[in-house]
From Swiss-Prot:
InterPro entries: E4P_DH_bac, GlycerAld/Erythrose_P_DH, GlycerAld_3-P_DH_cat, GlycerAld_3-P_DH_NAD(P)-bd, NAD(P)-bd_dom_sf. It holds the Pfam family Gp_dh_N. The keyword Cytoplasm applies. It is found in: Cytoplasm. This is D-erythrose-4-phosphate dehydrogenase. One of its GO terms (biological process) is pyridoxine biosynthetic process. The keyword Kinase does not apply. It comes from Vibrio vulnificus (strain YJ016).
Length: 346
């Protein structure tokens, strides 16, 4: 049993805890603690009720020091439940990971992300750390599960899980490059609103993000091309990306255009994705030609879902694809896959 602690109980932290149970991985992963500055009542409420993902199928209760995940519908104090320690500490070095025998910290704060931060968790008693965002270049490894998780080694103690968008697009790039050879590419990320945007116009260091999230399509900076280069150094200076935020609360679409070496038709491209989704990337990549819209991919655990009805090929070598992902739920599920891969690494 892998004992994990979740540091930061925001969108990703709460989804990670839900995914432990909804994916069935609670047989392999035990969450022993959550560190979050918010009050226990709010933590329990937002875990139980979620605007994007609906009501959690497990009943949640709490006291001032614990969250309780009940295995059945019995009243509080009866039936089986899992007890999760609640902590409210802002300094990593004060966290009681040693006393709690924590094997792995899932750091979902979005604040910490360099090797030194990870080592602070380890000094506090954790054995390993997995960050929920790209992190600094000095980490032991950055993993896009399904693409390079087999590069994990036992000595890789401070690891990044990449970003939701790299987890979405990198598996597709891998498939296309192995099948046809990629020369270069561009990506437009069409991303749902995030909590770094404003409900109504208000001050922000990024002037575009001073504007109300629900009223505009808002361009934002992205380092997605750098994330691709980190996984595939061969594509240094070969990809560029832009990103816009749109007034939806969840699910992201990625418009991928690549120039390839091989002369192909639409069916060649789509069949390659289908084959990967049924074999090497099963559970990571999915494929559909149904006439779906963004809400239909909400709570989908795959990293990427290719809409084959939108694949286009120009002059045999320019390929355009539409790739969907639930930027919260898919990423949370990959956090758990990577956590187990870190545990198993030799």
């Amino acid at each position: 049993m892998l004992k994990v602690a979740i540091n930061g109980f925001g969108r990703i932290g709460r989804n990670v805890l839900r995914a432990v149970y909804e994916s069935g991985k609670h047989q392999q992963i035990k969450v022993v603690a959550v560190n979050e500055l918010a009050q226990p009542e709010a933590m329990a409420h937002l875990l139980q009720y979620d605007t994007s993902h609906g009501r959690f199928g497990k009943r949640i209760s709490h006291d001032q020091e614990h969250l309780y995940v009940h295995h059945d519908a019995c009243p509080q104090g009866k039936g089986e439940f899992d007890s999760i320690r609640i902590l409210h500490l802002s300094e990593i070095n004060l966290l009681p990971w040693r006393d709690l025998e924590v094997d792995l910290v899932l750091d979902c704060t979005g604040v910490f992300g360099c090797q030194a931060d990870g080592l602070e968790h380890i000094k506090a008693g954790a054995k390993k750390v997995l960050f929920s965002h790209p992190g600094a270049s000095d980490l032991d490894n950055t993993i896009i599960y399904g693409v390079n998780h087999e590069t994990l080694k036992a000595e890789h103690n401070v690891v990044s899980n990449g970003s939701c968008t790299t987890n979405c697009i990198v598996p597709i790039i891998k498939v296309l490059d192995e099948a046809f050879g990629i020369e270069s590419g561009t990506i437009t990320t069409i991303h749902s609103s995030m909590n770094d945007q404003q409900v109504i116009d208000a001050y922000h260091s990024d002037l575009r993000r001073t504007r109300a999230a629900s009223q505009s399509i808002i361009p934002v900076d992205t380092k997605l091309h750098k994330g691709i280069e980190r996984i595939f150094p061969k594509f240094s200076n070969k990809f560029e990306a832009i990103s816009v935020r749109v007034p939806t609360v969840n699910v992201t679409a990625m418009d991928l255009s690549v120039t390839i070496n091989t002369n192909v038709k639409v069916n060649d491209v789509n069949q390659t994705i289908v084959n990967a989704s049924q074999c090497t990337l099963r559970g990571i990549v999915d494929y559909t030609e149904a006439p779906l819209v963004s809400i239909d991919f909400n709570h989908d655990p795959h990293s990427a879902i290719v809409d084959g009805s939108q694949t286009r090929v120009s002059n045999g070598h320019l390929v355009k694809m539409l790739v969907w992902c639930d930027n919260e739920w898919g990423f949370a599920n990959r956090m758990l896959d990577t956590a187990l891969a870190m545990q198993a690494a030799k």
